[in-house]
């Protein structure tokens, strides 16, 4: 049984959204940076006795695309909100900008928070000027809880560490939300509540 699903990936420019999507869907890591306006990818993901036909939408994080970006949010089942583990400003923008935009434009949609470029934090990034500026796992977990994310995952597109876990978490969050909504509808508003809290994979 195929289940269609739409997940939109958002976050500041240059945090690694496109690299994450390309590596996951094509096993290819891009060598040159090019700002994305909008793009989408598709992949089939097994989920229990079902196969999720996962449509992944890549968006531009730059401010000049702010008025167009929400057009991609229409009928989204969930979101992956990404920040760069070596860039504290990108982490700060999660709560200052991104979660506010998602809650305003897509209220109720589940959000998976993702810290990208894990390889730079783990692989001696101090010589690149990152050093202690890197975001620690506990900080990302705390941020995930603060914004009400379904899960917090740290990954590297380059090494593919935890890369699959990002999209597995997104699919799981969306499927659980659908099931909770279905039960709620069946019981005329008295149905089950979704799982609370924020899981973490780092």
Which residue stretches match the model-derived regions?
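TRAFAC-class small GTPase G-domain
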Residues: 1-181, 202
């Amino acid at each position: 049984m195929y289940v269609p699903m739409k997940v939109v990936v958002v976050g500041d420019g240059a945090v690694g959204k496109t690299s994450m999507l390309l590596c996951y869907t094509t096993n290819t890591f891009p060598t040159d940076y090019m700002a994305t306006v909008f793009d989408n990818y598709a992949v089939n993901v097994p989920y229990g006795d079902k196969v999720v036909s996962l449509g992944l939408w890549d968006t531009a994080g730059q401010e000049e695309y702010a008025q167009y970006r929400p057009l991609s949010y229409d009928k989204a089942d969930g979101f992956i909100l990404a920040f760069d583990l070596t860039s504290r400003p990108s982490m700060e923008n999660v709560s200052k900008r991104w979660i506010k935009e998602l809650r305003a434009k897509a209220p109720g949609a589940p959000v998976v928070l993702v810290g990208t470029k894990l390889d730079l934090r783990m692989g001696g990034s101090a010589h690149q000027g990152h050093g202690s500026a890197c975001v620690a796992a506990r900080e990302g977990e705390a941020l995930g809880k603060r914004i009400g994310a379904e899960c917090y995952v740290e990954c590297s597109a380059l090494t593919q560490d935890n890369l699959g876990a990002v999209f597995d978490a997104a699919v799981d969050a969306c499927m659980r939300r659908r099931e909770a909504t279905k039960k709620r509808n069946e019981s005329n508003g008295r149905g089950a509540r979704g799982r609370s809290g924020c899981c973490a994979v780092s």
